[in-house]
């Protein structure tokens, strides 16, 4: 599509924080989240049709922040329940299986849309064990205080992108504030908000489409 701004797909980015710098820079951005879609499987089908019809199947960048509630090490004491049959609505047998399914949808998007760059984030935990497809693509880890937000929450990124983000380290004077959030329905949403400093740094390192982000691993993936 000639003379169109670049197109970014931001998945499970409920607040739009990670995509915000791209929006501000004039990129065309589509936010896609299970909170919007109802049935996530039907929603994925609609998304594929939308991208293929409206943007000729082209995706320049893909960002993904799958729900971490079955993966994060901070919630390990609940894994046994989340792994148990009956802990999710059909067609899923367990809550963990459902969360793995949401993550593998991102993998399917990468294979189908072949973005110029892509990144998936999750806190320290077991996502790589349950979704081994990600393992060859682990690129970096960070804490929000590395990029200007004064708290800690170690997060890992997988994908093919430029990991040389411009740092802006500050003292983590707010500590591990995410662990202190009150219990309630919004706790997981608040914990999943992408730190704004990291989002800006990621954009600065990953907006120039003249750079070839694709590694040998990704080229092998696309050739398969």
Regions found by a protein language model. Name each.
Residues 1-224:
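Conserved active-site and SAM-binding loop architecture
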